[in-house]
A protein has these predicted regions:
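Short acidic-aromatic active-site loops that bind/stabilize oxyanions
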Residues: 256
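Short linear sequence motifs
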Residues: 11, 52-55, 285-288
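Acidic/Ser-Thr/Pro-Gly-rich, low-complexity N-terminal segments
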Residues: 1-33
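Alpha-helical transmembrane segments forming the membrane-embedded cores
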Residues: 259, 263-306
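Solvent-exposed, non-transmembrane regions of membrane-associated and secreted proteins
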Residues: 2, 7, 35-253, 296-306
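Cytosolic-side transmembrane helix boundary signature
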Residues: 28-45, 266-271
């Protein structure tokens, strides 16, 4: 008996080798990265703070170091000028222009030797050395002569004034000769000197290595007879008084600061358009000179005996 034939489903046709594969589904676009903090304003602020800190540190370096060199240069020039005038008997014995050399001060006890005293007690005058208060007589003349000196910056000639003791000698040479004084009293801003001797010398400086708020006073009596006084002494101004700031330096400070800003801006522009190293080398001397002028005028705004 023969088995019945079974019907088979038709076979699938063979896939063509040239059939195109089905396209893959498109992937979704990646989400945008989260926006980070804006660095522009922060970077500008950081640079501004860094620049301000650098300027302040530079100013401190000027006051505590470079100003000493400036005062030493003025002293050298003034000493040569005064020596010639003393030799030719043309040294001033009366009122003279501010900043002019008029005496040589020696205080052996604090190792202060051959220091030139200039006329005037403004902040700018005392950048040159100890200053003579112009409304008082010159040392060696009848009356009270007053000398101011700095305690911290610009050579700090009176930094050790507080070390003087009763009996220490002070010598002052002017156009009228050399005069000897003997320390006999002290004082400060709250306790002025009350010595009644007719012919005296008073030395004045600040009371602190930081910004002074009061004064140190040393009084000395003239040994021997005084020489005749010169012409009538001129009156003082507000900037001549102890602890005064030279507010006249403020306009100059603003102008020099503007010039410094323009010079730095010009250097930055030149560095972008030119060779950077060459641009900075050309600008460096100009910027340094302007920065020195800025610091000098800023120092004049501090108390004059600082």
């Amino acid at each position: 008996m023969t088995a019945p034939a079974l019907d088979r489903p038709p076979a699938d046709p063979p896939a063509s080798a040239s059939a195109t594969p089905a396209p893959e589904p498109a992937s979704a676009p990646a989400p945008p990265a989260p926006a980070g903090p804006r660095r522009g304003p922060l970077l500008v602020a950081a640079r501004a703070v860094t620049l301000a800190a650098g300027l302040l540190l530079g100013f401190a370096g000027y006051l505590l170091g470079l100003s000493d060199l400036q005062e030493a240069h003025h002293q050298s020039t003034a000493y040569a000028t005064l020596r010639d005038r003393l030799a030719n008997a043309t040294a001033p014995t009366g009122p003279t222009e501010d900043g002019a050399p008029l005496a040589v001060l020696d205080i052996p006890a604090i190792d202060l030797r051959q220091v030139v005293v200039v006329e005037g007690t403004t902040g700018r005058d005392l950048m040159r050395g100890p200053g003579h208060r112009r409304d008082t007589v010159l040392p060696g003349q009848p009356g009270v002569a007053v000398l101011f000196g700095r305690s911290t910056a610009f050579g700090a000639p009176f930094a050790d004034l507080g070390r003087l003791k009763v009996g220490d000698r002070i010598d002052v040479t002017t156009g009228q000769g050399t005069f000897h004084y003997t320390v006999n009293t002290y004082g400060d801003g709250d306790h002025p000197i009350k010595d009644t001797a007719p012919d005296r010398l008073v030395l004045v400086t600040g009371d602190s290595d930081w910004i002074p708020t009061s004064t140190v006073l040393v009084g000395a009596r003239l040994d021997g007879d005084p020489e005749p006084a010169g012409a009538k002494r001129p009156a003082t101004t507000a900037t001549d008084k102890v602890l005064a700031a030279d507010k006249g330096a403020l306009p100059a400070l603003q102008l020099w600061s503007l010039a410094l800003l323009l010079a730095v801006t010009a250097a930055a522009v030149a560095a972008r358009r030119w060779q950077r190293t060459a641009a900075y080398l050309c600008a460096a001397p100009v910027v340094a000179a302007l920065l020195w002028s800025v610091y000098e005028n800023a120092a004049a705004l501090l108390p004059n005996v600082y």
